[in-house]
């Protein structure tokens, strides 16, 4: 008989002890003093940015005013600022010229408007038969900014009595159609071309033979064809365009005296190479007082037969003059602003980023576009080594600074 009452073997209970580690395990091959050094570097970087922010707040106001004068429309800002914040050190007079004018375009004609860097002159214009370009028989005449004679006098020999030289920060133009929607027709085309003032020595048939220096314009051939980079749109949509300095430096140009026509009246057009004539008319009202380092904006308005095209033309430019010590303007001059690398860098960035032209309706948002370009550029520039990167790092984090200057 099997005994089933034998005691069963009891299994030993297994006890599992779990240890919870509350302290973080140091990473392998990373000493603690390395982490401390890294954290200290971050704190120092933030401290340096804070100090540069304070310095930038003091020094960048003329730079921001310079950007606003160069790119903001006059209905937003008419302050000429303190001048161009580059390495020039001297007394200057800043001026923002503005012209508002109603204009009508002749039917069956193509009207050419040149926004050229000529101080005191808002634009030059001429009309040619529809579908053609200016020829040797074409003469461009000026339309002045208000105050031309107060700045440059009423004679061709008094142009430099107040100021001796000048340089441009920007030129702007807008055409805002006012035509009846049932009567307008035609188109607007815009492009730019580099035009420079040149001095050429011509022989004079005298006994004994001699020569004379004559001022002529080179680059006007760019007006005779639509450039590859251009803007074309229906007339009723209008246009807005800007031109900025694309030279390495903002160089001053001399104020010229005794020039009413280019080429001069006693020099044949063919001998100078100019395709057409620039005539400023009576010296009591206008004149050619110089030519700056800016690309000329060319606007062609085509109006077919039967069209009734009218518009408001608005032009403005930001210029810096050097006043003469014995002139009344000298008392209104001021020292050129200190160097602002950030403002100059952003000026170049905006100039490269803007299109040749936009429709007139987008002029209202052009300053917003400029602000977005500046902000995005500063965010990218904060990673650049050197003073530009350091200053950009501070300014990109200081939104109140932008707001204080209209940004």
UniProtKB/Swiss-Prot annotation:
GO terms for biological process: proteolysis; symbiont entry into host cell via permeabilization of host membrane. Residues 1-12, 33-47 have a biased composition (Basic residues). Ca(2+) 4 binds at residues 221, 273. The record marks 363-364 as: Cleavage. Belongs to the peptidase A6 family. It is an enzyme of class 3 (hydrolase). Ca(2+) 5 binds at residues 249, 251. One of its GO terms (molecular function) is aspartic-type endopeptidase activity. The gene is alpha. Keywords: Aspartyl protease, Calcium, Capsid protein, Disulfide bond, Hydrolase, Metal-binding, Protease, T=3 icosahedral capsid protein, Viral penetration into host cytoplasm, Viral penetration via permeabilization of host membrane, Virion, Virus entry into host cell. InterPro entries: Peptidase_A6 (IPR000696), Viral_coat (IPR029053). The keyword Disulfide bond applies. Ca(2+) 3 binds at residues 161, 221. The record marks 402, 405, 407 as: Interaction with viral RNA genome. This is Capsid protein alpha. The keyword Disulfide bond applies. Disulfide bonds join 69-318. Residues 1-47 are annotated as: Disordered. Ca(2+) 2 binds at residues 161, 221, 273. Residues 13-32 have a biased composition (Low complexity).
């Amino acid at each position: 008989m099997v005994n089933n009452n034998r005691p069963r073997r009891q299994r030993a209970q297994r006890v599992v002890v779990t240890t919870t580690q509350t302290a973080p395990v140091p990473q392998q091959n990373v000493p603690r003093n390395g982490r401390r050094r890294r954290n200290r570097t971050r704190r120092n970087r933030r401290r340096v940015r804070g100090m540069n922010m304070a310095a930038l707040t003091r020094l960048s106001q003329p730079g921001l005013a310079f950007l606003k004068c160069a790119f903001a429309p006059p209905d937003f800002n008419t302050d000429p600022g303190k001048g161009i914040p580059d390495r020039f050190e001297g007394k200057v007079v800043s001026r923002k010229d503005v012209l508002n004018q109603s204009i009508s375009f002749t039917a069956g004609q193509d009207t050419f408007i040149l926004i050229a860097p000529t101080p005191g002159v808002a634009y030059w214009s001429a009309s040619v038969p529809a579908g053609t370009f200016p020829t040797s028989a074409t003469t461009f005449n000026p339309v002045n900014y208000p105050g031309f004679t107060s700045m440059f006098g009423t004679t061709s020999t008094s142009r430099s009595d107040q100021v001796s030289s000048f340089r441009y920060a920007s030129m702007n133009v807008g055409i805002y159609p006012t035509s009846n929607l049932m009567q307008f027709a035609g188109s607007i085309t815009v492009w730019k071309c580099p035009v420079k003032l040149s001095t050429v020595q011509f022989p004079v048939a005298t006994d004994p033979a001699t020569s004379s220096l004559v001022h002529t314009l080179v680059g006007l051939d760019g007006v005779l064809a639509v450039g590859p980079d251009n803007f074309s749109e229906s007339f009723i949509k209008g246009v807005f365009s800007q031109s900025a300095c694309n030279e390495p430096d903002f160089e001053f140009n001399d104020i010229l005296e005794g020039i009413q026509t280019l080429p001069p009246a006693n020099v044949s057009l063919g001998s100078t190479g100019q395709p057409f004539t620039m005539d400023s008319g009576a010296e009591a009202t206008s004149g050619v007082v110089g030519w700056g380092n800016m690309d000329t904006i060319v606007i062609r308005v085509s109006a077919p037969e039967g069209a009734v095209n009218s518009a408001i033309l608005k032009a403005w430019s930001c210029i810096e003059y050097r006043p003469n010590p014995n002139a009344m303007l000298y008392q209104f001059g001021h020292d050129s602003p200190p160097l602002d690398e950030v403002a100059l860098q952003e000026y170049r960035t905006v100039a490269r980023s803007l299109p040749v032209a936009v429709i007139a309706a987008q002029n209202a948002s052009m300053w917003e576009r400029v602000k977005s370009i500046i902000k995005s550029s500063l965010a990218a520039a904060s990673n650049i080594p050197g003073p530009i990167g350091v200053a950009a790092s501070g300014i990109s984090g200081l939104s109140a600074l932008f707001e204080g200057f209209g940004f």
